[in-house]
Amino acid sequence: MNQLKNSYKMINKKIKRIAFNRAAKTYDDYSVLQKQISLDLFDRLSLIKISPNFILDLGSGTGENNSGFKNIYKNKNIINYDFSERMLMRAKSKEKDFLGLNKLLGKNNISYICGDMEYLPIKKNLIDLVWSSSSLQWCNDLNKTFLGIKEILNYGGLFIFSTFGPKTLTELSAINKKLLRNDTVNSFTDMHQIGDMLVANGFS
């Protein structure tokens, strides 16, 4: 495991959380790249035969993925998990217009947890589908994150994700400057090393 430590620079989570909280209201206006990546990931997910009861969206942000989950899976339990409380508040506000109808029909099945994805306060083997789109780059310890995800996944569950690699540094720097008022980005782990980490943590 020591040989599989990720190459990210240590992230000051407190500073990043403040930045995302500040950007919550306008995040959707600028996150074009992230939205396209999520659409591509949904295309891949739609080809996989799985009927999850519990879906966990790690780094859910403003809840943009909720409609995609609802389109593929009907009446399932969706958990939005993010370390920015204001991002989650924004996600809740998108759902509020439908809460009355959802409660009436018994379909109000979205919950929200504010926390760090490196520390998942979720029951073991509960989650059938763990989704993470454009968020793993905010982890300081990918090995720890993958181990935590493996522990909460149900037997036969699916972990599907996308993350940024070294070649996306230029694009992400421009996005960070607009959204977070910061043009610095991390050095990202390449997919070969991420693959090794996944295997080391029991994924197949």
Label each PLM-derived region with a short phrase.
Residues 1-26, 35:
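N-terminal, positively charged/glycine-rich alpha-helical extensions of SAM-dependent methyltransferases
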Residues 33-52, 68:
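Conserved alpha-helix/loop element of class I SAM-dependent methyltransferases that forms part
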Residues 42, 70, 146-150:
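A structural alpha-helix within SAM-dependent methyltransferase catalytic domains
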Residues 54-120:
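Class I SAM-dependent methyltransferase SAM/SAH-binding core
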Residues 118-130:
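A short acidic, Gly/Pro-enriched loop at the edge of an enzyme's catalytic core
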Residues 128-143:
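A short SAM/SAH-binding and catalytic strip from SAM-dependent methyltransferases
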Residues 143-158:
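A short glycine-rich, Lys/Arg-flanked "PGG" loop and its adjoining helix->strand segment in the class I
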Residues 158-204:
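Conserved catalytic/acceptor-binding region of the Class I
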